[in-house]
Regions:
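Extracytoplasmic "Venus flytrap"/periplasmic binding protein-like
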Residues: 5-11, 34, 111-123
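Conserved helix-loop-beta element of the AMP-binding
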Residues: 17, 43, 117-130, 147
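Short helices/loops that flank or line small-molecule/ion binding pockets
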Residues: 70, 74, 88-98, 107-115
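Small-residue (glycine/proline)-centered packing/hinge motifs flanked by hydrophobic/aromatic residues
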Residues: 6-13, 127-145
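Hinge/capping helix and adjacent helix->loop/strand transition within the periplasmic-binding protein
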Residues: 3-89, 138, 151-173
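Alpha-to-beta junction loops
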Residues: 50-53, 75-77, 95-104, 117-120
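Beta->alpha turn/N-cap motifs
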Residues: 1, 58, 87, 104-109, ...
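Conserved functional loop/turn residues at catalytic and ligand-binding sites
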Residues: 39, 83, 97-98, 105, ...
């Protein structure tokens, strides 16, 4: 990610030609069950009252990490980022209460929420997810303007002929 790392072996803008957006998925703010806040408003109040909180991510620079940093900035809560080497190592610490919260790709944590092992406080998309319509968005829960989704897109090398890019776009869409 060129926005996060000064030295990249490529230039995302100059070296690639965008073909199409394939999919987006919301992230979901999840907390371990010992967190007393049952909704986002109470969680923000708790964070401001208690001081330092921790948030796990599946690694620095991921959409999960960026969601946490955006939340930290927008709420003013003093939060410490704990980067893990992937989701598989972060979730056990969240389940065990060693970290306060995590933004996770919604499809990854939804089952843990449904099983009652984690509590969802909101989704990061602009609208509620059809997969979990009972979970409010972060924005509708009081943090207006908050939106951070994971996205997947198809790119080609920058010198790919436009006709080829257009043909692949047409086939995918």
């Amino acid at each position: 990610n060129g926005a996060l790392y000064a030295k990249m072996p490529y230039d995302m803008v100059k070296d690639f030609a965008p073909i199409t957006l394939l999919a987006t998925t919301p992230n979901m703010l999840v907390v371990h069950n010992d967190v007393p806040a049952k909704n986002l408003k109470d969680f923000i109040a708790l964070g401001k009252k208690e001081g330092k909180m921790t948030f796990a991510s599946s690694g620095s620079g991921t959409s999960i990490h960026v969601s946490g940093e955006l939340f930290k900035t927008m709420t003013g809560i003093d939060m410490v980022h704990i980067p893990y080497k992937g989701r598989a190592t972060a979730i056990p610490d969240l389940l065990g209460g060693r970290v306060t919260m995590m933004f996770d790709n919604m499809p990854s944590s939804l089952q843990l929420v449904r099983e009652g092992k984690l509590r969802a406080l909101g989704v990061t998309s602009s609208q509620r997810s059809p997969a979990a319509p009972d979970i409010p968005t972060i924005a509708e829960s009081g943090l207006a303007g908050f939106e951070a989704v994971s996205w997947f897109a198809l790119f080609a090398p920058a010198n790919t002929p436009k006709a080829v890019v257009d043909r692949i776009n047409a086939l995918v869409n």
